[in-house]
Amino acid sequence: MVDAKTYIGNMVEVKIDRQMGTKHPKHGFIYPVNYGYVPNTVSGDGEELDCYVLGVFEPLETFQGKCIAVIHRTNDNDDKLIIVPENKVYSDEAIRALTEFQERFFESIIINKSTEN
């Protein structure tokens, strides 16, 4: 199992399996951002490590970007990487606002370079 925090500050290749504008397969909400995973990883839920891709405003199939933070769910074993184009910056408040469509169902903290220790 991979520790999601080790990705903070690093470039990451993401495979997008839920493009922005598509509907969640079980819950019916629309993804306002691209959502995917890091291939060949295993996270706390036994599946690949999930990622939100922020700062890109078109549907993607793959994306290489920088991990600026991790959403660590405190009531679920499924951390999410926050991946952005290199040199983009998002505040914790902006990350919360952009991921609220799905994260509102969970309790979480945002871990970034300044809070990871």
Task: Describe the residue ranges of each PLM region.
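Hydrophobic N-terminal alpha-helices or hydrophobic patches in metabolic proteins across all domains
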Residues: 1-117
